[in-house]
Structure formats: structure tokens, C-alpha cells
Amino acid sequence: MIQTFFDFPVYFKFFIGLFALVNPVGIIPVFISMTSYQTAAARNKTNLTANLSVAIILWISLFLGDTILQLFGISIDSFRIAGGILVVTIAMSMISGKLGEDKQNKQEKSETAVRESIGVVPLALPLMAGPGAISSTIVWGTRYHSISYLFGFFVAIALFALCCWGLFRMAPWLVRVLRQTGINVITRIMGLLLMALGIEFIVTGIKGIFPGLLN
């Protein structure tokens, strides 16, 4: 148990996968535009609300994801393939430079204009803790389902939300330094990492399904 608790390569891979999937740097321009009418204090409150919501959503996915799959009779290998396809699709949109705009539909965009609090919707859900991040968390939680691993993932999610909070606090400064070109470059790099992670999900799922089909 102690060995799994200190299995830092697994936790690091999970953390990097979340970072690439959510791509908080790419969401910064969206965050700035959505909070442009707010005071500095209100923007900080929105930032805290959004990232706390992200952590809660991913924690629920981590601990209850396997139960939800069993409730609907979905095998983890099938879910790995579906999640991998979704992750690859998001990665392709990131590489093409869409900056995650596919995560929010037209109705959600129109509702944003009249919504007083945007911290939970649409920032936390679906822009950050969207289907890709949720499915990825469920896959990791079911693959490494011991208490020690789940606690490690719990801490990794908390650190991820903390990092996103810090990035959003520095949002105006980062936009001035990186400019749109720099943000686009980072987004494409994250997209490549994300595509590799999605393909790994698909391959793992296929390996799990085919032995059953051959029996």
C-alpha cells in the first residue's frame, strides 16, 4: 500500500493528462472575456467558484464513476474506448486551434450573457470539467481503484484545481506576455499530448475487449 501511495509517475501522468485535457491556458482568454464586466474582487470570486466546482465534479467522478458504470451495465473497457475517442476528438479541435469552443454549445453561450454567476456554468462545466475530463478521471479511477491510488488522485485533482486558480489569477498578465500566438502554440502542444493519451485509452480498451470476443 505504501508503494502505491508513492507511485508518483502514475499521479504525474494523471495530472499532466488533466492539464492537457482541460488546457487552462487556452481557457484564459475565455475567462477574461466572461469576467470583463466584473470588479477584481468579483473576478477572484468567480475564479475560486469555478476551480472549486471543477475539483468537486472530478472528485465525484473519481469515487462514484465505477458505480455509475455498473448501474448502467457499461464495461470499463467499452468506456475506455468511448472516452479515448472523445479525448482524441477534443485533441483534434485543440490542434486545429479552436481553443475548446466546441465544449460549449450555442444555447449555453446565449445563456452566459444573462447569467449572473458564471463560475459553475459554463466555466467549470462544461469548459473545464467537461465530458473529456470526467471520462478520463473515471478511467483512471477504475484502472487504479485501491484506496491509496484514489487518495493520490484526490490530491492530484486538488493540486490541479489550485494550479488553474493560480493561472486564472494571473490571467491578464499571461495574456499580455504570451499574446494570442503563444496561447495558440501551447494549446496545440497540449492537443498533441492529449491525442497520445486518448489513443492509449483506446488501445487499452481494445486489449481488454478482444480476449472476451475470442472466447
From Swiss-Prot:
<keyword id="KW-0472">Membrane</keyword>
<feature type="transmembrane region" description="Helical">
    <location>
        <begin position="147"/>
        <end position="167"/>
    </location>
</feature>
<keyword id="KW-1133">Transmembrane helix</keyword>
<feature type="transmembrane region" description="Helical">
    <location>
        <begin position="120"/>
        <end position="140"/>
    </location>
</feature>
<keyword id="KW-0812">Transmembrane</keyword>
<feature type="transmembrane region" description="Helical">
    <location>
        <begin position="14"/>
        <end position="34"/>
    </location>
</feature>
<comment type="similarity">
    <text>Belongs to the UPF0056 (MarC) family.</text>
</comment>
<feature type="transmembrane region" description="Helical">
    <location>
        <begin position="81"/>
        <end position="101"/>
    </location>
</feature>
<dbReference type="GO" id="GO:0005886">
    <property type="term" value="C:plasma membrane"/>
</dbReference>
<feature type="transmembrane region" description="Helical">
    <location>
        <begin position="54"/>
        <end position="74"/>
    </location>
</feature>
<protein>
    <recommendedName>
        <fullName>UPF0056 membrane protein YhcE</fullName>
    </recommendedName>
</protein>
<dbReference type="Pfam" id="PF01914">
    <property type="entry name" value="MarC"/>
</dbReference>
<feature type="transmembrane region" description="Helical">
    <location>
        <begin position="189"/>
        <end position="209"/>
    </location>
</feature>
<keyword id="KW-1003">Cell membrane</keyword>
<dbReference type="InterPro" id="IPR002771">
    <property type="entry name" value="Multi_antbiot-R_MarC"/>
</dbReference>
